[in-house]
């Protein structure tokens, strides 16, 4: 397939949140590093950029993040050992919404 626009990867994924601090702490606990935090005056939103290796997430507190069908509800992370990561998550304080791994 022709790459007529010169796209070479994903720069970042933007995720709305209702609690920026809680979201930042969650991603930090997974090993992400906060590379920038700011305030978007035009939108009236606190913003944070988090990075792990070459993967970047922008999260912004807009007070309108919905947990419903059609809402952006997950980010897929590539890991070195999915079984080990799943066990670590299950053993931590996180809510696990599936009882087994789903390989795609």
Which positions does each model-derived feature cover?
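Conserved small/polar residues in nucleotide/adenosyl-binding loops
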Residues: 102-104
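Basic/polar N-terminal segments that are highly enriched at the extreme N-terminus
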Residues: 1-4
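Vicinal oxygen chelate
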Residues: 8-19, 48-51, 65-90
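A common structural junction motif
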Residues: 93-97
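Core segments of cupin and vicinal oxygen chelate
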Residues: 7-8, 14-56
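Acidic-residue sensor for enzyme active/binding pockets
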Residues: 58-61
